[in-house]
Amino acid sequence: VFLEPKPFSVGVRIEQRQSVIDAGLYGKQAGHPALPKGEYQLSWRDEQGRGVYTFCMCPGGYVVASSSEEETVVTNGMSEYARDGENANAALVVSVDASDFGSGVLDGVAFQRRLEHQAFVLGGKDYRAPAQSVKSYLEAAAPDLSQAATTPSFSCGVREADLHSLFPQPINQMLEQGLRRFNRRLPGFADADAVMTGVETRTSSPVRITRDAQSFQALGMQGLYPCGEGAGYAGGIMSAAVDGVRIAQQIIGQY
């Protein structure tokens, strides 16, 4: 089969108190029993086309460990059915491409692994995650979580760390832009009480199995249908499901 590198996104999990997000969205009506837990989806793109956006927002949720290799730390998010946790969380990520990690087929994978291992090191090498208040990150100050009212919910615990040291400068610049811009659009998104936990690297695959545009079969391997997130054709549950439907329809149409 043929492989090709593809753009993906990296960043952090940001957490706010759910009550703050509800107030930012609903104003005086926040807390009304008829209203659902507040959700958000925010994005911005600079003049060069690089994007920063929120992804997989989890109202009343928790930040969970998602590592798949030793000596790495990876964050993800989830909500339970009741969505009644104290915090809201979402991935806050920046798009990256070959200009960031190189043009080799597996250069994106290597970049991803470096970030995940560096997060492991910053977290104290015991699978805690590095975390920092949004306020100290934006002010380039010492990472002090004690001043933030939001308690990080990462399942393995956190360790205060300077998240600037985790990312290259272009990614830090976009994260800073996103925090400031999104806080203007949704008051409380990036206030002094919000916290960030790293590292978020699994929004989509950094590599793609090349498939024929008409048959959807892998180039050089008849009968193999690359599909969904792992194959590089989706970035989330819904888009993976849609891609699966497309593949199924193609197979049905052949027989």
Language model segments and positions:
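Residues forming the flavin
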Residues: 1-255
